[in-house]
Amino acid sequence: MQSPTSKEKLQSLLRWIGLGMLCCLTLIGKAEGDWRDNTKLLVYSPRYFGANAFPTPEMYGGRLPARWAAELRGDFHRMTGDKTKDIYASLYIPIAQGKAGVKVQGVIREFYKTSEAVRDERHAVETKPVIPCYGDVVINCHYQVLRSEKWADITVSANLKTASGGRLCDARFTDAVNYWFDTNVGRTLWQTPEASIRLQGLIGFYCWMTNDLIHRQNDALCYGLGLTGQWKSLTLSSTWNGIHGYEKNGDRPMALRFRAEYELLKNALAFQYKKGLKDDLYQAYSISYIRYF
């Protein structure tokens, strides 16, 4: 029997290489197809997305801050089958001595680890990020409508969440915008030179785009109630707020929040605990550093 020549060996090697490349391309194409197929199955609602996908309207107690404020915060979110950590930053810019204000905020980086059960329920691809996951940029524009010690303090706002967040395939951030308009009302119930107690409420309209070919957007009511107490440099607050969508597909999250902030020489530390209710499945712990100017 004659041994294979060098030319025959080379041809055989090239055939095996070609076969291997074909198998790799087939697997890659299948993976890409699976990823794109899964996005059609995603449910664009707070229940079936990550902890930061649907920002909640903020409560200012009817009074806009008169100072610049820069905040850096770390959040730790927990639910059954999902552990999420993130780094958040914001900048509040007062306008016309506090009669208006603009806030720019967002999640700089998100880290997450989900179970396979949560991944499958959300129709996600991965259980943890294979590339860095960045959050959405949110822009809030506020205006002080009324400021009255006798009656009440009232602010209105227009807000936009951009579609800049990543990892849609893992159901972390949507590829669509959210926008909302709300009214904040607050009134001081009791006050001394060093302490005060205020009642606050929020009502508004919240809307986000979806991937549903029939219902292209979900229109919702946003609401909230809260109580804030202040003594010298210490501020304690508790709020209850949420969103009430009309599709009933996990679009009705609520949350209780308890926050403590202590300020010293324009530097403040804040701690917050959030208990998610109904379609908000997360508990969250936060620690913030705020610098006032």
Predicted regions: what is each one?
Residues 73-81, 109-113, 146-148, 160-170, ...:
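Sequence/structural signature of outer-membrane beta-barrel proteins
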Residues 142, 150-152, 195-202, 222, ...:
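Residue-level detection of beta-strand scaffold positions
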Residues 20, 51-56, 222-223:
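Short acidic/polar alpha-helix capping motifs at helix-coil junctions
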Residues 1-47:
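Cleavable N-terminal export/targeting peptides
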Residues 80-84, 130-136, 172-178, 194, ...:
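Transmembrane beta-barrel outer-membrane domains
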Residues 174-245:
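Detector for outer-membrane/organellar transmembrane beta-barrel domains
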Residues 31-162, 177-184, 234-239, 256, ...:
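Transmembrane beta-barrel domains of Gram-negative outer membranes and organellar outer membranes
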Residues 115-117, 121-127, 214-215, 221-293:
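Outer membrane beta-barrel transmembrane domains
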